[in-house]
Amino acid sequence: MKKEPKIVMIYLNNAATTLFKPPEVIKAATISALSVGRSAGFDATAERLSALREKLLKLTNARDHFVVLTPGCTFALNQAILGLAARLPPCRILVTQAAHNAVLRPVYALAKRRFPCAINAADEFGRVTPTARSTARTSNQKTGNNPTPKPPYEAADNGFSYGVVPTDEFGRVTPETLAPHLTPDVKIVVISHMSNVTGGIDDIAAITKLLRSRGIYSIVDCAQSVGIMNVDLSNIDIAAFPFHKSLHALSGIGAMIVREGIEMEPLVYGGTGTLSADKDMPDFPPERYEAGTHNLPAINAALAALDWLEKYEEEIRGNLDYIGKRLYNGLYDLYPKVKILSCDNPGAIVTFVTTDTDFDSAVFAQSLYDHGFVVRGGLHCAPLMHERLGTSLSGAVRVSPGIDTTETQIDSFLLTVKRLISP
């Protein structure tokens, strides 16, 4: 029986996770995995952790901040949103239509009282103290004020609420479009630096300047931007990003950049290697937010990735820009059968639909897979963005080349799309 020739897959889903990992990264992770594990308390490990934090602060120009290492970007965003809210009196949180579910779902959970925040236990400056929490608990016990638990998804009564700020068609907001939504009860605004659907980029410097002038905390989701462009986080309060995307390191590690002086409740409690006799977590960062054993192979891989990125940064970004424009222009030439949803400066994200009335992004993505191309169909974990685009039912096809994507591969992809949309 004659065997079918094996299709060599071309990976174009780098916005989800980058396929290419530099040899230095693989080597660092392998050596670390094969070595005797050492906790953060050992000098050599402490030096590696300190070096990684310092490199991240330099990369993001965040000198007045500290770095919290997390199991990933989703964890970091949960820690930022829920941990910060737990230190505030009941308030309103704003997200944008570009928000990823890693932002939306923690906010929804908070508003539906599915996260234990310290309600009505703040001082006059909005700070929650152990004494205030204890007083609130004692008062509730004396008065019998123990509210009956409400079933999931019922309207909240804890005072927290959220609002969605409309974006333009590329998922962008500006200080001018954001300002009317900044009512006195808004205390946290979560911004998506780069849309994972359209590649649209927000001016976070201008936005966070506005928020700071109003005394509002800023949380910035930098999952798509760090590594692919210069990112200046000097004005933000909290930012989160992973290492497995454009930093070309491993999954299982993320980072949270936090302005000095900002306090949050920890999301996870456990051993830190410091103050082990205390019943509570240490009250100083980053240990307060880093319970448990660090992912040392991923940390060593991240260090190697940052060294590699610093060496080849200009070459990497130049290639991505060229390949991204070639992809965008090629799909643009297929109009009107193909409609591009990305902005005309898409970086490495180009998302499209076809004008076929029966278009289904999952089916189209599968057809591309059958022809040897890995792309991403569906809603991309950004349902509000697809509502804005009118693609909630069909979804869209996202194509995200990487630094190792060639002109030949892009041209082959474009030819395949053309054949699939032809009658």
Indicate residue ranges for each PLM-predicted region.
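Pyridoxal 5′-phosphate
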Residues: 1-142, 146-423
